A protein has these predicted regions:
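Asp-based, Mg2+/Mn2+-dependent phosphohydrolase catalytic module
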Residues: 2, 107, 123-233
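N-terminal helical cap/lid subdomain that shapes the substrate entry/recognition surface
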Residues: 2-9, 13-100, 107, 111-112
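Conserved phosphate-coupling serine/threonine residues in phosphotransfer and NTP-handling enzymes
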Residues: 12, 120-122
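Residue-level detector of family-conserved "landmark" positions at structurally sensitive sites
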Residues: 38-40, 69, 119, 174, ...
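Residues at secondary-structure transition points
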Residues: 70, 74, 78, 93-100, ...
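Short beta-strand-loop/turn "lid" adjacent to the catalytic site in phosphate-handling enzymes
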Residues: 115
Length: 233
């Protein structure tokens, strides 16, 4: 009988959103842009998932000045690539760590025979950097679905549906771990029972569709999480 836990990354495995915000600002500065995303603005921008999509949203909805004439899509791709380099440099420099309880959950779940997977909108490079620094690599995770591996990012269910396909499991045999409403809507739309551990940018969001909301994962024995999965035949 096979069961799996599917993890989001940013805000779930680690409070990385603040590091992402600073990496965006570093990329903007390197590009000679006067843009600066403070915490209040970034919280608003997090309504959109995906870094390139977030930059596009900022340009279109916040009247961002300084966009060069020509191919805006190419400009956004270049800017996002610079941001990814800045982010991975920060992570490699030890500026992030796992959220309390995550390391213990991964270890305990593995000891109980759970399969582990990742479903995230962040880039594979970002996932590799984070897991390399915090866990010594990606070996704990059998399946990693990241970045542009699907056409539609969260809150669409695509990335979770891809993870289920690669795991060859029904949604009922899995539980998802998320930190945001967009992530919750994505996993629930894929039919997966979902545990939410709110992060610094997502506390106060509506998590009414969650099977379980846990403010302090480190204070749990994880049995309530495991109980949400139905063993597959």
């Amino acid at each position: 009988m096979s069961r799996a836990i599917i993890f989001d990354v940013d805000g779930t495995l680690s409070e990385t959103e603040e590091t992402h915000r600073r990496a965006f600002n570093r990329a903007f500065e390197q590009a000679g842009l006067a843009w600066r995303w403070d915490q209040a603005l970034y919280e608003r921008l997090l309504a959109v998932t995906g870094g390139k999509e977030r930059i596009r949203y900022f340009i279109d909805d916040f009247d961002a000045a300084g966009v060069p004439p020509g191919d805006v899509d190419a400009f956004i791709r270049s800017l996002h690539a610079a941001k990814t380099i800045a982010y991975t440099d920060m992570v490699s420099g030890g500026e992030v760590e796992l959220r309390p309880g995550i390391r213990e959950l991964i270890s305990d779940a593995q000891s109980r025979g759970f399969r582990l997977a990742i479903a995230t909108t962040t880039t594979p490079a970002n996932v590799d950097a984070l897991l390399g620094v915090t866990l010594g690599g990606c070996d704990a995770f059998e399946v990693i679905c990241a970045g542009d591996s699907v056409a539609h990012k969260k809150p669409a269910p695509d990335v979770y549906e891809l993870a289920l396909e690669k795991l060859q499991l029904d949604a009922a045999a899995c539980v998802a771990l998320e930190d945001s409403r967009n992530g919750l809507l994505s996993s629930v739309a894929a039919g997966i029972p979902t545990v939410v551990t709110p992060g610094i940018y997502t506390r106060g969001q509506d998590f009414s569709e969650a099977a379980l909301v846990i403010d302090d994962l480190a204070a749990q024995d994880f049995s309530a999480i495991y109980a949400l999965t139905a063993p597959a035949a």
